[in-house]
Amino acid sequence: MKTKKLGNSDIETSEIGLGCMTMTGIYGPADENESIATIHAAIDNGVSFIDTADAYGGGSNEILVGKAIADRRDKVVLATKFGNIYAKDSERGADGRPEYVREACEASLKR
């Protein structure tokens, strides 16, 4: 698997990443064991860039990814996103306030 430096940092990651959005039922039912096996297979085959977001399943995707990489954390560059807000009435919005950024990052780290 080809790798490259992430921006100007010393972090090196695979050129191919694994997006995990659909692993928590965004487009229909998802099997947790199958999703974890998929993440493990990707890592075993050299994929080190794993992508998730707090909006995927209301944080459940981050929990799933965390469970999958728990014993492989040193092999993974983990990316998450935040800022998408979903209200109870299905209204969408965005929040980029500094206090929300901190809150979202802390919540993602806990998951």
Question: For each of these PLM feature ranges, what is it?
Answer:
Residues 1-77:
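N-terminal binding-site loop/beta-alpha segment at the start of enzyme catalytic domains
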Residues 75-87:
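A short, structured active-site edge motif that brings together acidic residues
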Residues 42, 81, 111:
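Conserved catalytic core of Hanks-type protein kinase domains
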Residues 88-111:
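Glycine/proline-rich, positively charged
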Residues 64-68, 81, 100-107:
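Generic beta-strand or strand-like secondary-structure segments
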Residues 22-27, 85-91:
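A short acidic, helix-capping loop that chelates divalent metal ions and anchors anionic groups
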